[in-house]
Structures are given as C-alpha cells and as structure tokens.
Amino acid sequence: MKTRKVLDAYALLAYLKGEGGHRRVKEMLASADSDLLINAVNACEVFYTLARARGIREAEYFLNVILPGLPVTVIDNTFEEVIEAARLKAAHALSFADCFAAATAIRERAPLVTGDREFEKLGRAVDVDWLE
C-alpha cells in the first residue's frame, strides 16, 4: 500500500537546488512507495522563489517542464480549503503559504515533508517528516 506525503515548497526547492535534504526528496520521487502531493499555492511558492533567485525563464521552465515531469500531484483549493489555511494563519505565526501546506497535510492525513523549522510552531497539529 502506498503512503501519501505532502511536499512543502522547501522540499522541492531543496531537490531543485541540491540543498540539504535533496537526496531524500530524490529518493521519494524515484520510489513507487509514496503518492506525493503538493498544494498549488506551494508549487507557486517554488515558482516565485526560482523567479527571484534565477530569473523568470528558469521559473517558467520549472512550471512547464520540470513539475509536469515529476510524480507529484498538484492539489487545487476550494474556498473551504482556503478557509482551513486561513484558520491556521489566524492561530499560528506562519506564512500563509506554509498554512496551505499544513492544511493540505491535515486534510490528506499525510505527513508534511519539509526542512522548514517554522512548522515546529504547529506542534502536533501536523505530522512532519523532517528533512535533514
């Protein structure tokens, strides 16, 4: 049985940039053991981070070539799901994008893959699979 995991933008950026935790993310992407998900907001977070750091062309390449080629399902948001993220934002000092990642993990009952220590603020509300 496959396990579901939700990727935070941190995980995909680590993979793309070869930063800390990138090997684990690469293994997850290559493994048939996990269904990998990312919220659309967090995929956009990867896009704008790449655009700022490396330019719009590289960000567009990620969006149009790399992301569609990865075994990752992009999860869109209904209004109710946006409100779930807003409730987390109201209760915790996290970025709104991080709240979407957390809300997706909670809704999907799946661990959130990240190395972003900001998620420690959520305590046990989210099961985090920490990247080293």
Model-derived features: where do they sit?
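Conserved beta-strand segments of alpha/beta enzyme cores
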Residues: 35, 71-73, 127-129
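Short beta->alpha linker loops
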Residues: 20, 41-42, 77-80, 100, ...
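Short, well-structured N-terminal submotif of metal-dependent ribonuclease cores
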Residues: 1-38, 51-65, 131
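Active-site neighborhoods of divalent-metal-dependent phosphate/nucleic-acid chemistry enzymes
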Residues: 72-113
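A generic structural signal for short hydrophobic patches within well-formed alpha-helices
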Residues: 12-13, 43, 119-120
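Acidic active-site catalytic centers that drive phospho-/nucleotidyl reactions
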Residues: 8, 45, 98, 116
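Acidic, PIN/NYN-like endoribonuclease modules and their adjacent C-terminal/linker elements
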Residues: 2-4, 102-132
